[in-house]
Amino acid sequence: MAENGDKEQKLDSDTKICEQIEYYFGDHNLPRDKFLKQQILLDDGWVPLETMIKFNRLSKLTTDFNTILQALKKSKTELLEINEEKCKIRRSPAKPLPELNDEYKNSLKHKSVYIKGFPTSAILDDVKEWLKDKGPIENIQMRRTLQREFKGSIFIIFNTDDDAKKFLENRNLKYKDNDMTVLSREEYHAKKNEERKLNKSEEKAKSKQVKKEAQKQAEDAERKLVEERVGSLLKFSGDLDNMTSREDLHALFQTHGDIEWIDFSRGAKEGIVLFKMNAKEALDKAKAANSDNLKLKGKDVKWELIEGDTEKEALKKILEGKQESFNKRKGRDGRKFKGKGRGGKGNDSSSRKRTQFQGKKKTFDSSDDEDDMEESESPQKASVKAEESAGTKNGAAAAPGSPKKRSLDDKAEDGPAVKQSKTEVGDQ
């Protein structure tokens, strides 16, 4: 009994080792793995086992060369070859990588399935264990946030379209006590498109409501301001001197009422004065001081108190004109006080001539996960950085003068010591 258990455990271990190495050299990982692609170019595709055991997930399974070789010999895929010296492996030249054209990408979509409902604390091994009796799977993508936190959902790629269709026939699945959401990739994108349309419609309605409320608040504020100023307008008209100015009006009322604004242009025959106080009081005081004969620059003037709707319209126009004038003046003041650099050149001008570093630009991978737009650094770049960090394990010392390597404890779970890789690429 114990002997049979040991054999089963050994068989399971060999299967995991073989699957892991075949994943590294497989159709989904190899095109994205810059480090491994570089190694392949060095020796006609051969990669030393000494290099392979520095890959994180494989090193957790075994670092023994003989164990690796024995596991690979049991493989039925014929994907990998072992060299005569039994110290290197490579992808078989008889099984070249597929061409990454539209036809191939479409075939992947038809074999892809979206599954949601895993706890965010789940790891790749948990997911693989749950999937092990659900059909032959080529690739598992653990979907993550920009902060590398698991979202609780995955994309899996089956070996064939039929395998994916068979899996989709039974969608009443559970992970422990969690009900799972299962969709084909086409259904997933259709669902996301509908959600985006709905969100866009909701945002549009929300924006419209916000604008409507803002407009109402502005109108209420304006109405309140107008109501507060009722009784403060005084209209004047007549055969005015062409040289009459606003300064003349200020001089006329300076001891009788504070003037806030005058709507008048030199040469005009009428205008309106906005007082900070009641216009009738100011007019009565000015008339009393001038024997009830209030002239403007020696000319007879008709003075009128504006009332009712006419007053409200005039107040609205004057207050708008006052605000517009204030905004223009503020803009001129802002330009006026811009600093000058040496040589009399403005600092803003000189700064435009200098090229400034604006930080690392980020691109977004929108090929399949348009809804998530996960931040994307080249997966090849992430992989080579990861393998560089793995260079000190198993006695392999860093090259003289090379930068200090990170500890292998920083390695991620989905490849050879991945350094905070930005995009999830076939976690296996």
Swiss-Prot record:
Residues 227-349 form the xRRM domain. PROSITE patterns: HTH_LA, RRM, XRRM. PANTHER family: LUPUS LA PROTEIN HOMOLOG, LUPUS LA PROTEIN-RELATED. InterPro entries: La_dom_prot (IPR045180), La_HTH (IPR006630), La_xRRM (IPR014886), Lupus_La (IPR002344), Nucleotide-bd_a/b_plait_sf (IPR012677), RBD_domain_sf (IPR035979), RRM_dom (IPR000504), WH-like_DNA-bd_sf (IPR036388). The lineage of its organism: Eukaryota, Metazoa, Chordata, Craniata, Vertebrata. Keywords: Nucleus, Phosphoprotein, RNA-binding. It comes from the Eukaryota. Residues 187-223, 323-428 are annotated as: Disordered. Phosphorylated. It is found in: Nucleus. This is Lupus La protein homolog A. Residues 328-343, 352-361 have a biased composition (Basic residues). It comes from Xenopus laevis (African clawed frog). GO terms for molecular function: mRNA binding. Residues 111-203 form the RRM domain. The gene is ssb-a. One of its GO terms (cellular component) is ribonucleoprotein complex.
